[in-house]
């Protein structure tokens, strides 16, 4: 894979990677499905990337994944719509990481739909990349369990693992 455009929801997630890898192209999409969809459409139209890799932190539904684990999302499921309208979106780039299914949610507490992790942007990015014909992948590091209160999240450990994964992959 040629050097992809790395997309992060927040500058806080991107900053450690920017410092470690100033040679990589990085963009910020914002948090949630609406903001990320609008931002990534503009990013794809203006930058015309050959590939996109969404990077960031995620919550795990069970302790089968540990805080700091790095995973590649193979499929995004969106639980925010009634079941008759739900779709799944697939990664089109394979990464040499443990693969998981992710649930894109707009609020904590949405049903897991058979997913191992949840995030707030993945389905939107996968759908946009498919619409534009841009190959895509998603890397997530586990910062918390979905039942944890915010004070229990370990964002520093997750970001450290994310930097290591980016260095290994790109």
State the predicted function of each range:
Residues 1-5:
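Extreme N-terminal starter segment of soluble prokaryotic enzymes
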Residues 14-170:
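Glycine-rich phosphate- or other oxyanion-binding loops that anchor nucleotides, phosphorylated ligands
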Residues 9:
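Internal glycine-rich, Lys/Arg-flanked active-site/core loops of soluble domains
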């Amino acid at each position: 894979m040629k050097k992809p455009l790395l997309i992060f929801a927040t500058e806080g997630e991107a900053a450690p990677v920017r410092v470690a890898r100033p040679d990589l192209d990085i963009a910020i999409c914002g948090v949630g499905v609406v903001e990320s969809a609008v931002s990534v459409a503009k990013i794809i139209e203006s930058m015309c990337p050959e590939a996109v890799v969404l990077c960031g932190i995620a919550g795990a539904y069970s302790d089968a994944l540990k805080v700091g684990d790095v995973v590649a999302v193979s499929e995004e499921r969106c639980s925010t719509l009634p079941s008759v309208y739900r779709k799944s979106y697939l990664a089109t780039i394979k990464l040499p990481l443990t693969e998981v299914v992710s649930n894109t949610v707009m609020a904590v507490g949405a049903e897991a739909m058979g997913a191992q992790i949840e995030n707030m942007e993945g389905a939107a990015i996968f759908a946009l990349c498919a619409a534009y014909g841009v190959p895509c992948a998603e890397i997530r590091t586990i910062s918390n369990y979905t039942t944890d209160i915010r004070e229990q999240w370990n964002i520093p450990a997750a970001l450290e693992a994310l930097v290591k994964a980016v260095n290994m992959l790109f």
